[in-house]
Amino acid sequence: MTNIRKSHPLIKIINHSFIDLPTPSNISSWWNFGSLLGMCLILQIITGLFLAMHYTSDTTTAFSSVAHICRDVNYGWIIRYLHANGASMFFICLFIHVGRGLYYGSYTFLETWNIGIILLFTVMATAFMGYVLPWGQMSFWGATVITNLLSAIPYIGTNLVEWIWGGFSVDKATLTRFFAFHFILPFIITALVIVHLLFLHETGSNNPSGVSSDMDKIPFHPYYTTKDILGFLVLILMLLILVLFSPELLGDPDNYTPANPLSTPPHIKPEWYFLFAYAILRSIPNKLGGVLALILSILILAIIPMLHTSKQRSMMFRPLSQCVFWLLVADLLTLTWIGGQPVEHPFIIIGQLASILYFSLILVFMPLASAIENNFLKW
């Protein structure tokens, strides 16, 4: 009798994806973040589902329903903070996952990379809409400012914004539709994740050296399942430390004030994981230019495979490209810091320089470093 995991039509798919999957023997801990993202997604869907059971998407009761969850629902506070801080963990894993793809040249798997970019956009949209739901001051004004950016689109901009709002300002209709989208998008993300994995398993995983590992593969289980479980435990530990000791560390105090359309907070800013893009948006004085720069700051990932001029795939043996990569990481951290600062001297000029450097590093210095390295190696 054949083994059920190899013969059953459904279990067979799981077997080929997570058990008997041939995996390079040398992939490092940077490859753990894909599975950690899967765990974050499952955690967000479960906690979100329980929150949705008690949340009401009406402007008059949304804020108090979140307070009710924290005060009156059994373990509601921990579910709420797991969901809020789970989003931060999700984005930390996302940024590291994308960074690893950049460093080790995983972007040469075009289909996987492009689905990943779509996933990044979808997750960012979901997180933005989730931030609006508690209906605090920063929720309301964040929604107003970000949706208003669409009015920069020539000719149809104003109509588009009012269509998204469902009225002439951010109101009940906006909150209801944001809740509906925030609820459905994670399931769309799950479907996209399956497609992402499908494309990945067509080619097999990349590895740190960037060369073909066909001659040196090992089964995913037990080697990498064990390694992934260790990653899960570390991430859960970090999340629980954050949730149980300082759940408000990454939040905004303004969001504990109910939304008031008549009072603007002194500094409107999004959650920390959007600050780098927000800093790029603010660094351009022109509204349309800022919006385009904001979109391009993420969309630029799509042209990275075209800018790959090196004869080697990975940056593992390319010291010059490594310097450019870590400069880019430092620049993104600078942009994140600037995004949270008020619009005044010296932050304006620092933001503008960091924004120019961000695009220059990707569009000019990365291909240039690769070309110089090729020249050194007489390739």
Curated annotation (Swiss-Prot):
* Keyword terms, alphabetized: Electron transport, Heme, Iron, Membrane, Metal-binding, Mitochondrion, Mitochondrion inner membrane, Respiratory chain, Transmembrane, Transmembrane helix, Transport, Ubiquinone
An individual GO BP term: mitochondrial electron transport, ubiquinol to cytochrome c
Q: What residues bind heme b b562, as annotated?
A: H83, H182
GO CC entries: mitochondrial inner membrane; respiratory chain complex III
Binding positions (heme b b566): H97, H196
Q: Where in the cell is it found?
A: Mitochondrion inner membrane
Annotated cofactor note: Binds 2 heme b groups non-covalently.
Q: Which cofactor does it need?
A: heme b
Q: Where does a ubiquinone bind?
A: H201
Q: Which domain of life is it from?
A: Eukaryota
- What GO molecular function annotations does the UniProt record carry, in alphabetical order? metal ion binding; ubiquinol-cytochrome-c reductase activity
InterPro entries the record matches:
Cyt_b/b6_C, Cyt_b/b6_C_sf, Cyt_b/b6_N, Cytb/b6-like_sf, Cytochrome_b, Cytochrome_b_C_euk/bac, Cytochrome_b_N_euk/bac, Di-haem_cyt_TM
Q: Return the Gene3D superfamilies for the record.
A: Cytochrome Bc1 Complex, Chain C (1.20.810.10)
Q: Per the UniProt record, which residue ranges are transmembrane? A: 33-53, 77-98, 113-133, 178-198, 226-246, 288-308, 320-340, 347-367
Identify its membrane topology class: Multi-pass membrane protein
PROSITE patterns noted in UniProt:
CYTB_CTER, CYTB_NTER
Task: Spell out the note in the miscellaneous section.
Answer: Heme 1 (or BL or b562) is low-potential and absorbs at about 562 nm, and heme 2 (or BH or b566) is high-potential and absorbs at about 566 nm.
Family label: Belongs to the cytochrome b family.
Summarize the subunit comment. The cytochrome bc1 complex contains 11 subunits: 3 respiratory subunits (MT-CYB, CYC1 and UQCRFS1), 2 core proteins (UQCRC1 and UQCRC2) and 6 low-molecular weight proteins (UQCRH/QCR6, UQCRB/QCR7, UQCRQ/QCR8, UQCR10/QCR9, UQCR11/QCR10 and a cleavage product of UQCRFS1). This cytochrome bc1 complex then forms a dimer.
Record's function text: Component of the ubiquinol-cytochrome c reductase complex (complex III or cytochrome b-c1 complex) that is part of the mitochondrial respiratory chain. The b-c1 complex mediates electron transfer from ubiquinol to cytochrome c. Contributes to the generation of a proton gradient across the mitochondrial membrane that is then used for ATP synthesis.
Q: What protein name is recorded for this chain?
A: Cytochrome b
Q: Which organism is it from?
A: Tapirus terrestris (Lowland tapir)
Q: Which gene does this sequence derive from?
A: MT-CYB
